[in-house]
């Protein structure tokens, strides 16, 4: 049995928006549940690396907050998400560091991912200093080449 150190299944599937709108956001397909577990394991590795970075640079708390993980089709439609969103597959999360070092986290994550397979790393809605509002991390896409290794910025 695989042990997950930092992230829970509930954390990757909960949604305040779904609760408020009374939308069922529980994944039904086993493949989606497996994807979420794979994402949890990947995020555990990210957290381990970020913990070391925070210790070395004196950044403080290395916790990573999941703002959005898996989204059911109904939830994705309600928030006007992309029809091809990796959140629908359970292979993406919008995350940010609890310590507020969003820019440093994004830059560190880009370097951390440089020798790994992933789909997308997106700096979402950065401020004038380049600090993302959050970071989107997709580990596996739905395309012929699921590991696109794209690093993008959405303004």
Question: Positions of the model-derived regions?
Answer:
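Extended, low-complexity, intrinsically disordered C-terminal regulatory tails
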Residues: 44-80
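A broad, low-specificity signal marking well-ordered, structured residues that form hydrophobic/aromatic
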Residues: 64, 93, 135
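Short connector loops at helix/strand junctions that flank enzyme active sites
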Residues: 59-61, 88-92
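Extracytoplasmic cell-surface/polysaccharide-interacting catalytic and binding patches
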Residues: 1-59, 130, 148-155
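Solvent-exposed, flexible loop/coil residues
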Residues: 11, 16, 74, 79, ...
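Amphipathic alpha-helical interface surfaces
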Residues: 35, 39-42, 75, 91, ...
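Catalytic cores and adjacent binding grooves of peptidoglycan-active enzymes
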Residues: 84, 89, 97-155
């Amino acid at each position: 049995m695989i042990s997950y150190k930092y992230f829970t299944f509930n954390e990757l599937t909960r949604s305040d928006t779904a609760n408020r709108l009374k939308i069922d956001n529980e994944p039904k397909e086993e493949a989606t549940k497996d994807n979420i577990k794979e994402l949890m394991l990947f995020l555990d590795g990210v957290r381990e690396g970020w913990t070391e970075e925070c210790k070395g640079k004196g950044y403080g708390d290395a916790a990573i907050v999941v703002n959005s993980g898996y989204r059911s089709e109904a939830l994705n439609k309600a928030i006007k998400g992309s029809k091809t969103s990796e959140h629908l597959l359970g292979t993406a999360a919008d995350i940010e560091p609890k310590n507020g070092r969003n820019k440093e986290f994004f830059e560190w994550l880009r370097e951390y991912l440089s020798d790994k397979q992933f789909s997308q790393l997106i700096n979402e809605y950065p401020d004038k200093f380049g600090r993302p509002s959050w970071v989107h991390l997709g580990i596996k896409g739905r395309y012929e080449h699921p590991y696109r290794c794209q690093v993008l910025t959405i303004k």
